[in-house]
Amino acid sequence: GDRNFLRF
């Protein structure tokens, strides 16, 4: 989901 950005 939009939480994919947390992978940074």
From Swiss-Prot:
One annotated Gene Ontology cellular component of this protein: extracellular region
Family per record: Belongs to the FARP (FMRFamide related peptide) family.
Signal peptide: none
Protein name as catalogued: FMRFamide-like neuropeptide FLP1
Intracellular or extracellular location(s): Secreted
The keyword 4Fe-4S is annotated on this UniProt entry: no
Bilayer-spanning residue ranges: none
Residues annotated with Phenylalanine amide modification: F8
